[in-house]
Amino acid sequence: MATALALRSLYRARPSLRCPPVELPWAPRRGHRLSPADDELYQRTRISLLQREAAQAMYIDSYNSRGFMINGNRVLGPCALLPHSVVQWNVGSHQDITEDSFSLFWLLEPRIEIVVVGTGDRTERLQSQVLQAMRQRGIAVEVQDTPNACATFNFLCHEGRVTGAALIPPPGGTSLTSLGQAAQ
């Protein structure tokens, strides 16, 4: 400690021992305007897009007790809708929905904002640990009956939100007529 104190006092007493401050010619100063010669770190970033048009959003055209019609493609049984794809979802009822069955929603990039869950012909309560796992990962969950979940999913996609859906087809009595058939 005494040596450090002695060196400090010597350093203050003899300014010639100090190293002159180094001024870097490329370092920005107050009031400095950027020029093309400046370092890349201080220049604006430019983004060029490979695909100019936004990808077509997923829309549920119709549903029945056997499955769903999504963007004109028939999907049989329960399915998970992701921003640009549809996958079969291996659940039989709302009781089969676990943390593992939702894991595909939090593994994706860009991150999904909200998952709409259709539980059949009635709104059913999901297990609390499943909802808590989604909440911890920053994903909102909206649980509805399948007819309302389909409408909510379409609405959120139309708004441009990053949305996922986990849908179980409703049993026999309910169905949505395809929008194309309803117009005829």
Curated annotation (Swiss-Prot):
Q: Which organism is it from?
A: Homo sapiens
One Pfam family, short name please? DUF498
Phylogenetic classification of the source organism: Eukaryota, Metazoa, Chordata, Craniata, Vertebrata
| Compartment(s) where it occurs, according to its Swiss-Prot or TrEMBL record | Nucleus; Mitochondrion inner membrane
- Give the protein name, as stated in the record: NADH dehydrogenase [ubiquinone] 1 alpha subcomplex assembly factor 3
Q: What is its main location?
A: nucleus
Q: Which GO terms describe its biological process?
A: mitochondrial respiratory chain complex I assembly
Source organism, top-level taxon: Eukaryota
| UniProt keyword Membrane present | yes
